[in-house]
Amino acid sequence: MNTKIFNRHFSPRSCAIAVGMALGIALLSGCGSFMRSDFEPPALAIPEQWQNTTVNEQVKVDPWWQQFHQPELDKLVSQVLSTNNDLTLATLTLRKARLQSGLTRDDLYPQLSANLGASRNQPLDGGDATKSYQANLSVSYEVDLWGKVSANIDQAQWAALASAEDRESTTQSLVATTASLYWQIGYLNQRVDLSQKSIAYSKQTLALTQRQYDSGAVTQVNVLEAQRSMAGQEAAHSQLIQQLTVAKNALAILLNQAPAADPAQSLASGETWVEIKQLPDVAVPDVSVGVPADLLVRRPDVKASLYQLRSALASKDATYASYFPSLSLTGGVGESTSELKELLRNPVGSLGAGLVLPFLQWNQMQINNDIADIDYQTAVVNYRKTLYSAFEDVDNAISAKQQYRYQGDKLAQQFSAAAAVEAIYESQYRNGAIGVQNWIDAQENRRSAEAALLENRYNQLTAQATLYQALGGSDIAPPLAKE
């Protein structure tokens, strides 16, 4: 006959007492808040006036790419933000940081554990076998006497916030890169089209020169000059084709596609966008902007640097607190009710108490505290550097926008004059007044002026995008899916 022996038994009352014990221990937390360092923003030398500043209207830049009123660009940006690998990696990093923050926060509360066991004993003399069952519920808790646990929680939370801003910074960069590639493809398509027209025009020039040579009107040198000009244009045309291929491949990578895929035909959403064949002939959005310091604080890289600074300060506090005595309380529930009463009457005496005295490791403590302080000072320098770089980015972007606009006006005048000179030389050559080289040179000058004007148009668009990115703006990153 088998006999069952229960070494541990829990009643509902016992479980309630155990839960009450855990809650009581939790009230001991927070005793070390007095050891936290107060955050003081680093001193910054911010200029009273900017070199390139006009103050007229409130800046609104989000979503800034829509200010160009190009539906195909809007569609492309949306697709990149939903498929790009860099943004996916940044999202995974953010999720990991948030999970780590949650794990750290759990250290504030008592940790419960339970185990069940069973054994069977069979006497060698053939007597009755016995079975026994064991059940234990234990509680462990580190009292946050000096704020170490709280500092670790702060460090993890600030790190998670910094990770969120890193993701937003990745988003801002992706949008700017997408817009730049979109316009670059349009610019190169337009250059390729102009190049094809110029080659066809050069062929006509060569044919005309050949006929004149055959009739004895010009020398062979004129024919060779026309051939040289056409060969140079064909070589330049090949280079443009290569640049266009590189731009399309770069866009395919942004869209999470293999290189050589046609971005216009294989969007993951099933939509298609019409590849831009020329730069948009619309006015570049005008942003009249004063740049106060608080405007740049919204930039994700600046916010991330600030959060990293706060995280470093909390880490410094945690390192400092880790060398103060730490008190760990452990208790087990599974005995008689009288033992539970004793535990609640005198918790520190009844619970297992482990007192660790790390401050005895004096040399190691000093070194680790110095390392933590250096990490904090490094974060201060990085924050100051990031903010100053933000001011530099905006100042440079405003200057570039202004100078490209000025250059555009002058290049338009240059193209107009070059086209007029070409027409005059063509007429003179056809009438036999000048040699073919003068006409060929005029053609080259006109082509160069037209290419420079087109490139300036591309530069104005990208400079505007760079300014929008430098200003930061509100968050544009896609929201995270619910965990």
Annotate each predicted stretch with a short phrase.
Residues 71-117, 131, 138, 142, ...:
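Intrinsically disordered, glycine/charged-rich N-terminal periplasmic/extracytoplasmic linker segments
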Residues 240, 300-301, 307, 456:
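Metallo-beta-lactamase
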Residues 133-139, 291, 349-355:
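Hydrophobic, lipid-facing positions within transmembrane beta-strands of outer-membrane proteins
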Residues 2-6, 15-19, 25-82, 157, ...:
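Terminal intrinsically disordered/low-complexity segments used for targeting and assembly
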Residues 108-130, 140-169, 188-191, 267-269, ...:
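Small/polar (Gly/Ser/Thr/Ala-rich) solvent-exposed segments
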